[in-house]
Amino acid sequence: MTRRPPRFWLRPTRSIAARLLRPFSFIATTLTRRRLRQPTFHASVPVLCCGNITTGGTGKTPLTLDLVQRLRDRGHHPHILSRGHGGRERGPIGVNPNRSTPRDVGDEPLLLAQSAPTWIGADRAETARLAISQGADCLVMDDGFQNPTLHQDVSVLVVDGVTGFGNGCVLPAGPLREPVPDALARAQAVVVMGDDRHNLIPTFPPHLLTAQARLVPGPEIRTLQGRRIVAFAGIGRPEKFFDMLRDAGVAPIRSLPFPDHHFYTPRDIQRLEALSRESGTTLVTTAKDAVKLPFPFRTQVKVIGVELLWADPKSPERLLDLLFSAS
């Protein structure tokens, strides 16, 4: 049901397949470096980017939401910029959480728009100008680490602590969008999500602000204790959501992974409803998936939000201090 990455991408040693594909990785790296040398627009307000260099989910959207809320708590008026992956609109346009649809603007922007004004557009510079004209005093980019059109005062590289950088190779030989040294040279901070199983943190350059955090379910998880649930998710790494439920003591009797940014079809909905009726269970999904579910089916599904738990509570505040000192 999901498109799983090749196994050799995640092996610590480079396989024969990876070695055979390396010439194509060299071409991809050359093109990326050339694109990153394009002229950059400097916005009149601070710009923070939460991005990654691997395919699949790393937790950058929960990080974006966490930092946006902290900016609001400081009295700022942050606006969020997103590419709008999966949507038809090219932008720049504002996302209306009550009127915009996932097929128009994408699923992540709809989720982000529930927390702060959110704009989508392929041209980040043009989108930034529009957001600033509408009152933004700082901008937070959800993804866009490899987008050169808008200068980033602070670039935060988000790394999954379990998978790390995989086999260390660039697409298609590995999961990376660019070489790790290139990314670290542009970043000002690195946030490792989850256990640092590859002991990456000590290897990062000392000038980078490094932090560690993990994703935990929201308080609504308590209502599921002792209940039989069927969990489904169409995110970058659905198994992370299922594992999070198990760690919270809510083990699904069945887990259904869907591709990232998946649009649920009538057939999908019928299947999920049938599973719920047959087993007498509660359907559970993510907030990102919930925005794509049609009414009234959405009311039949329990939505579990995700929160960020920082290893050092001072880390996010240091990151925001860095943003305003750099701009």
UniProtKB/Swiss-Prot annotation:
One of its GO terms (cellular component) is plasma membrane. GO terms for biological process: lipid A biosynthetic process; lipopolysaccharide core region biosynthetic process. Its EC number is 2.7.1.130. Pathway: Glycolipid biosynthesis; lipid IV(A) biosynthesis; lipid IV(A) from (3R)-3-hydroxytetradecanoyl-[acyl-carrier-protein] and UDP-N-acetyl-alpha-D-glucosamine: step 6/6. Keywords: ATP-binding, Kinase, Lipid A biosynthesis, Lipid biosynthesis, Lipid metabolism, Nucleotide-binding, Transferase. It catalyses: a lipid A disaccharide + ATP = a lipid IVA + ADP + H(+). The keyword Transferase applies. Residues 78-106 are annotated as: Disordered. It holds the Pfam family LpxK. The keyword Glycosyltransferase does not apply. Disulfide bonds: none annotated. It is an enzyme of class 2 (transferase). ATP binds at T54, T55, G56, G57, T58, G59, K60, T61. It comes from the Bacteria. NCBIfam families: lpxK (TIGR00682). Transfers the gamma-phosphate of ATP to the 4'-position of a tetraacyldisaccharide 1-phosphate intermediate (termed DS-1-P) to form tetraacyldisaccharide 1,4'-bis-phosphate (lipid IVA). Belongs to the LpxK family. This is Tetraacyldisaccharide 4'-kinase. It comes from Gluconobacter oxydans (strain 621H).
